[in-house]
């Protein structure tokens, strides 16, 4: 799959996002409880594409002492504050978690909302950032930041399906193996959605 940034811009801006649409793929791929959809909390994440010669995606690894999603690999993001839209929330959270100034983010487009098994309806916002920023993880929330080649994470052959038990039920979810920490669950599902959109 090509990771040319102009091609990505063109594909995403041409894509017709359906607000509130439950994506084809979720972190409970085959068994998401659709009865929960009305009670989901709005949230947003920034999907930061770093504009290197070979573009990369920026991920955070959450601190092990966090109350939610401890130690997991994630995009920077969180719930919407009152009066915020998804883009503003994604930029605010990215600045809080990684010291990324919003002025340096070229917002390309939001993609389909992503419903998580933990009760959130997440809007992923794809943005392009320059490669020379002095980013820094928020000490209380983020253990580290790392990059993964965009071509790698968009490669469907790296999108593994696994099963495991959660809250007494067997769940099916995506995993994208990586040396700095496996990308799995909701974050991997959002990457799979992005790959699907770019190849439609």
Give the role of each language-model region.
Residues 139, 157, 195:
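Short, flexible helix/strand-to-coil boundary loops that buttress conserved ligand/catalytic motifs
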Residues 153-161:
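A mid-sequence, solvent-exposed acidic-amphipathic segment
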């Amino acid at each position: 799959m090509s990771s040319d940034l102009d091609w990505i811009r063109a594909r995403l801006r041409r894509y017709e996002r359906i607000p509130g649409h439950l994506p084809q793929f979720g972190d409970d791929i085959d068994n998401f409880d659709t009865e929960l959809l009305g009670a989901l909390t709005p949230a947003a994440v920034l999907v930061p594409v770093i504009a290197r010669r070979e573009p990369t995606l920026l991920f955070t690894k959450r601190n092990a002492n966090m109350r939610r999603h401890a130690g997991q690999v994630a995009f920077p993001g969180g719930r919407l504050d009152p009066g915020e839209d998804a883009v503003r929330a994604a930029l605010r959270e990215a600045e809080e978690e990684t010291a990324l100034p919003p002025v340096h983010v070229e917002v390309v487009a939001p993609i389909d909302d992503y419903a998580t098994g933990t009760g959130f309806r997440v809007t992923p916002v794809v943005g392009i950032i320059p490669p020379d920023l002095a980013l820094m993880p928020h000490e209380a929330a983020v253990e580290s930041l790392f990059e993964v080649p965009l071509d790698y994470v968009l490669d469907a052959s790296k999108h593994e399906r696994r099963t495991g038990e959660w809250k007494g039920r067997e769940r099916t979810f995506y995993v994208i193996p990586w040396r700095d920490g496996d990308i799995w669950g909701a974050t991997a599902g959002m990457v799979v959605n992005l790959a699907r959109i770019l190849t439609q």
